[in-house]
């Protein structure tokens, strides 16, 4: 199966939206979705939401939060990046 890495996954809009798009793709069923963000609190919140949705809908995906970027990208098949530069 594929390893899909989402860099900047802690964003409620990008993270959850992209995870939902992946969940809807029949060709990606069984993939591991690696969530990465430098904000560990946001990463935890998105991971919990994704896991809850995955379990509720009995989806065949693995969700893996990783705070180390190099570890997250190791052996990735796909990488989607959405980050904000600078301060809000």
Which residues make up each language-model segment?
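Metallocofactor- and cofactor-centric catalytic cores in central/energy metabolism, strongly enriched
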Residues: 1-88
């Amino acid at each position: 199966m594929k390893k899909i890495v989402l860099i900047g996954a802690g964003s409620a809009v990008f993270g959850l939206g992209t995870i939902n798009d992946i969940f809807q793709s029949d060709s990606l069923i069984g993939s591991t979705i690696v969530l990465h963000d430098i904000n560990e609190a946001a990463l935890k919140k998105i991971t919990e939401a994704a896991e809850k949705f995955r379990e509720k809908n009995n989806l065949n995906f693995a969700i893996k939060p990783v705070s180390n970027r190099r570890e997250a990208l190791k052996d990735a098949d796909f990488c989607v990046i959405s980050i904000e530069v600078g301060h809000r």
